[in-house]
């Protein structure tokens, strides 16, 4: 079977890392990129040099209006570059892109993302939560994808991708009565380097490098969309902290069935080595956040940091590279839905 052909709209943090993940996984073929704000020579530079994940280990250059990306032992990607502001104008079909990753953060509804289908794309994967597109978390509910009807889908958020596999394992084994999630989250591009105006959410406009900033997140409630049994049982919030990448979820939950910490560790380790291998990982090491930069998992359970008050009340800790782990799942989701075509 030929590899799925992919277009990327928006060559920002996620767009570029989806391309890196695609090159490393070698499971999809990226054939087009669109970004109205980045010239092709600037794309080469931004892809090659990354302050967080380091220099790209392969080669990247441009020939005419094509990016040529290659890495030793991996397939070469010859990528047509577009600079359209209107997604309906991007010639995905002409470039041969069947699957479009919508990573601008702008076209996150079915109506807006539908513009990509007009340009010849067959499916759109939104790399953000969506108000109305069905959300899929690889390892949790990706098998509910319906090829006949799901043309525009969401890969949910990086935090939902971390929390959902953990919540699934705990709920399947012990049952979750209710839970609260906190994510201690690295800075992202929407934040300000110094204090500035920020619409209705005044705190979000404060300097990212000098503050711990309480923020809202829909990630916990979104778990109820991907695991219907948990609908209405989880909510959460975020603290934005001055680190460039890697975040950590703290899930505090009441369990239906009593469990020891060893019981919990055992079922998570079994899932990480079995059905959720590659998505969920398990560590007993004395780790800190930078140990997970460029980690490809959605969620890495920290056995040593997790605690219990009593057999029905637990606090579980799980790390995630909110950029690269998530980008790898975007590629995995495309690989999966392509098998249903």
From Swiss-Prot:
A molecular function (GO) term: glyceraldehyde-3-phosphate dehydrogenase (NAD+) (phosphorylating) activity
Active site as annotated: 158 (nucleophile)
Keyword NAD: yes
Enzymatic reactions: D-glyceraldehyde 3-phosphate + phosphate + NAD(+) = (2R)-3-phospho-glyceroyl phosphate + NADH + H(+)
Binding site for NAD(+): 13-14, 35, 85, 322
Keywords: Cytoplasm, Glycolysis, NAD, Oxidoreductase
EC category name: oxidoreductase
GO biological process: glucose metabolic process; glycolytic process
Site feature location: Activates thiol group during catalysis: 185
GO cellular component: cytosol
Domain of life: Eukaryota
One Pfam short name: Gp_dh_N
InterPro entries: GlycerAld/Erythrose_P_DH, GlycerAld_3-P_DH_AS, GlycerAld_3-P_DH_cat, GlycerAld_3-P_DH_NAD(P)-bd, Glyceraldehyde-3-P_DH_1, NAD(P)-bd_dom_sf
Subcellular location: Cytoplasm
UniProt binding sites for D-glyceraldehyde 3-phosphate: 157-159, 188, 217-218, 240
EC number annotated for this UniProt entry: 1.2.1.12
Pathway(s) the chain acts in: Carbohydrate degradation; glycolysis; pyruvate from D-glyceraldehyde 3-phosphate: step 1/5
Chief location category: cytoplasm
PANTHER family per the UniProt record, alphabetical: GLYCERALDEHYDE 3-PHOSPHATE DEHYDROGENASE, GLYCERALDEHYDE-3-PHOSPHATE DEHYDROGENASE-RELATED
Subunit structure: Homotetramer.
Family per record: Belongs to the glyceraldehyde-3-phosphate dehydrogenase family.
Protein name in UniProt: Glyceraldehyde-3-phosphate dehydrogenase 2
């Amino acid at each position: 079977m030929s590899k799925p052909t992919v277009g990327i709209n928006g060559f920002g943090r996620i767009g570029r890392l989806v391309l890196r993940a695609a090159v490393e996984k070698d499971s999809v073929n990226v054939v087009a990129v669109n970004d109205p704000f980045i010239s092709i020579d600037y794309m080469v530079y931004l892809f090659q040099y990354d302050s967080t994940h380091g220099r790209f280990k392969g080669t990247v250059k441009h020939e005419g209006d094509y990016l040529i990306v290659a890495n030793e032992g991996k397939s070469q990607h010859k990528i047509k570059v577009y600079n359209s502001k209107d997604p309906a104008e991007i010639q995905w079909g002409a470039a041969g892109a069947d699957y479009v990753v919508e990573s601008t953060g702008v076209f996150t509804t079915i109506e807006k993302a539908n513009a990509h289908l007009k340009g010849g794309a067959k499916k759109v994967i939104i790399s953000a939560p969506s108000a109305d597109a069905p959300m899929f978390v690889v390892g949790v509910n990706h098998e509910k994808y319906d090829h006949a009807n799901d043309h525009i889908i969401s890969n949910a958020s990086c935090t939902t991708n971390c929390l959902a596999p953990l919540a699934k394992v705990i709920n399947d084994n012990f049952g979750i009565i209710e839970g609260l999630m906190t994510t201690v989250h690295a800075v992202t591009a929407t934040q300000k380097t110094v204090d500035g105006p920020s619409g209705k959410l005044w705190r979000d406009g404060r300097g990212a490098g000098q503050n711990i900033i309480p923020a809202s997140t829909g990630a916990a409630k979104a778990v109820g969309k991907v695991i219907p049994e948990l609908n209405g049982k989880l909510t959460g919030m975020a603290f934005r902290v001055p680190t460039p990448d890697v975040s950590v979820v703290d899930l505090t939950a009441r369990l239906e069935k009593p469990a020891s910490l060893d019981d919990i560790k055992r079922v998570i380790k079994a899932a990480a080595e079995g059905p959720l291998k590659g998505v969920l990982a398990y560590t007993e090491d004395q780790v800190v956040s930078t140990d997970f930069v460029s980690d490809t998992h959605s969620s890495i359970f920290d056995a040593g940091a997790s605690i219990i008050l009593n057999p029905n009340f637990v606090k579980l800790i799980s790390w995630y590279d909110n950029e690269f782990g998530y980008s790898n799942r975007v590629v995995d989701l495309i690989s999966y839905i392509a098998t249903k075509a």
